[in-house]
């Protein structure tokens, strides 16, 4: 696939209607569209529709496992949380972690607008690295992390024990638009992102690592049994 063809395909997928006119998903899709508008207004980086559909598919695929929990580490809690809940079974919950109270408020309102019960969301207004160590190990099917490059390795190490076997860590924008491959780049952010990718290679047979051309480059780390 040429670069032009890929861009055209991605644009087409992102242009598909994100809102169903009727059916059980209609209120969720409408809430996602509203949350995306709010994120843009506040200058937050939210995953595009293509990435969001992958998140929904990942949580839907985990619906038969013993764990139906997910964690969102991102300022765009409303958008990410809704996509995660969209694919979850009714007992599934999303733990939203971000220090900004306004981001937490937006997520609560978005979940309510989508028709989700208050118990479906757990809200921790804290820095991720301050609370992840206190969360139950092997209890989450998916962790979505949009963090600064300098925090990537610490977040990887903190979230890895939380995943159930078969669970996936989604590292959004972790490839920095492929600048990690440019060895001439020595700035702190690029060096940290590159080091995080090198660290993942040490996981060996404990994980399956996948890279997807979503956003600035997304890395999926799936824990094996």
Stretch-by-stretch model annotation:
Residues 1-142, 147-164, 168, 174-225:
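A short alpha-helical cap/connector motif
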